Amino acid sequence: MTNIRKSHPLMKIVNNAFIDLPAPSNISSWWNFGSLLGICLILQILTGLFLAMHYTSDTMTAFSSVTHICRDVNYGWIIRYMHANGASMFFICLFMHVGRGLYYGSYTFLETWNIGVILLFTVMATAFMGYVLPWGQMSFWGATVITNLLSAIPYIGTNLVEWIWGGFSVDKATLTRFFAFHFILPFIIAALAMVHLLFLHETGSNNPTGITSDMDKIPFHPYYTIKDILGILLLILILMALVLFTPDLLGDPDNYTPANPLNTPPHIKPEWYFLFAYAILRSIPNKLGGVLALVLSILILIFMPLLHTSKQRSMMFRPLSQCLFWILVADLLTLTWIGGQPVEHPYIIIGQLASIMYFLLILVMMPVASMVENNLLKW
């Protein structure tokens, strides 16, 4: 008799994805982030569901309902902070996951990579709308500033912004629809993640060498299940340390002030995980140019397979490309820092230089370095 996990229609899918899946024997801890992202998503959906049970998406009561969750609901404070800091952990894992893909050339799996980029955009949209829901000062002004960027689109811009707002300013209609979208999007993300996995399992995983591993596979369970469990425990450890010791470390104090359309905060800035893109946006004096640079800073990932000029897939044996990759990481950290600083000297010029450097590294320097390395192979 065949094992039920191999014969049952549903169990068979789980078996082929998480148990008997042939996996390369040499994938490092950088391959842990996929499962960690899955755990983050489940955690966000669960904590979000419990928050939604007590939250009211009305401008008059939204801020009070969040206060009520923290003060009066049993363990409401821990649910709220797990959700807020869970988003930060989600983005840390996302950035690591994308960085791994860039370093080891995983973007050559075109369908998997493109769905991954769509997932990144969807998660960013979800996080942005979630930040608006507590209806604090930074929620309100963040929503106003970011949605207003769409007005830079020629001809239809203004109409588009008013259509998204549901009126002539960010108000009750905006908050209600943002709550609706924020609730539905994680389920769309879950569906996309399944398609992401489906395409990945068509080709099998990449590995650090970038060389085919068809002749050297091991079963996913128990080798990588136990490895994933270690990653999950570390993730929960870091998340709970944040939640229980410094829950407001990554938040903005302005968001503890109820939204007031008549009073603009001195420094409007998004959550830390959007600061790099925000810095690129601010570094261009022209509104439309800034918006285009903002979108391109993430959309550029779609073009990575086209920009791959090396004869080798991975950067494992390419010291020049490695060097440029880590300069890119440093550049992104610089942009993140600049995004949180006021618009004044010397931050403006640093932001502009870092933005130019970002696009130069990806579009020019890395492809050129790859071609140089190709020629060095002949020596």
From Swiss-Prot:
Residues bound to heme b b562: 83, 182
Keyword terms, alphabetized: Electron transport, Heme, Iron, Membrane, Metal-binding, Mitochondrion, Mitochondrion inner membrane, Respiratory chain, Transmembrane, Transmembrane helix, Transport, Ubiquinone
Intracellular or extracellular location(s): Mitochondrion inner membrane
One function term, GO molecular function aspect: metal ion binding
Any single GO BP term: mitochondrial electron transport, ubiquinol to cytochrome c
Cofactor binding mode and count: Binds 2 heme b groups non-covalently.
UniProt topology in membrane: Multi-pass membrane protein
Cofactor or coenzyme needed: heme b
Quaternary structure annotation from Swiss-Prot or TrEMBL: The cytochrome bc1 complex contains 11 subunits: 3 respiratory subunits (MT-CYB, CYC1 and UQCRFS1), 2 core proteins (UQCRC1 and UQCRC2) and 6 low-molecular weight proteins (UQCRH/QCR6, UQCRB/QCR7, UQCRQ/QCR8, UQCR10/QCR9, UQCR11/QCR10 and a cleavage product of UQCRFS1). This cytochrome bc1 complex then forms a dimer.
Summary of the function given for this chain in its UniProt record: Component of the ubiquinol-cytochrome c reductase complex (complex III or cytochrome b-c1 complex) that is part of the mitochondrial respiratory chain. The b-c1 complex mediates electron transfer from ubiquinol to cytochrome c. Contributes to the generation of a proton gradient across the mitochondrial membrane that is then used for ATP synthesis.
Designated name of the protein: Cytochrome b
Provenance organism: Moschus moschiferus (Siberian musk deer)
Taxonomy of the source species: Eukaryota, Metazoa, Chordata, Craniata, Vertebrata
Gene: MT-CYB
